[in-house]
Amino acid sequence: MIRTRPSAHVDRRQLLRLGFCGALTLAGVEILGSVVPYMQVRKIVGLGVPVNVGSKADVLAAFKASNDAPILFRQGHFFLLHAPGGIVAAYRKCTHLGCAVPWSAAEDLFHCPCHQSKYDKHTAVVVDGPAPKPLQLFHISETADGLVVNTNPLEVIDRPHNRWDPAVIEVAD
């Protein structure tokens, strides 16, 4: 004998209720999926944290081997420069409109691609262009582990005048 199920069909109200619950569940999953990645703790690297750049002897040897070419540290957004009398860390942000300033080996200076400002390779002072002042400098210190650059953009050395001032050197040759 075959038994029939008395409620085998779904009426319109049950179908709408199931569809509404399914849509709410799907929307909740999408919202949760977009929020969860922001809740993960990430290791902080780059701009805003101290960056160890090696020993002073290694940095000076790299300058000597490359004819004092600046050393780029991409993760910290800065260049190490062999300034007259010491080592400084120049922030790569142009003082005109904030573009990232690359090193041009062909011109032997920093050349901003946005509005053609040019900066000296040793002191980061403006050589030519619309930039109003030299590149900002990060604080640099000598520790037992080597040279450490503080890449906090809120604690930069802002030089208001377009000339080299030896007082900004924190690590001497």
Task: Show where each model-derived region lies.
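Short N-terminal micro-motifs specific to bacterial/archaeal maturation
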Residues: 6-7, 50, 115
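N-terminal pre-ligand scaffold of iron-sulfur
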Residues: 17-104, 137, 141-173
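Structured, soluble extracytoplasmic/luminal domains of envelope-associated proteins
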Residues: 86-128
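Short edge beta-strand segments in beta-sheet-rich domains
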Residues: 48, 114, 121, 130-137
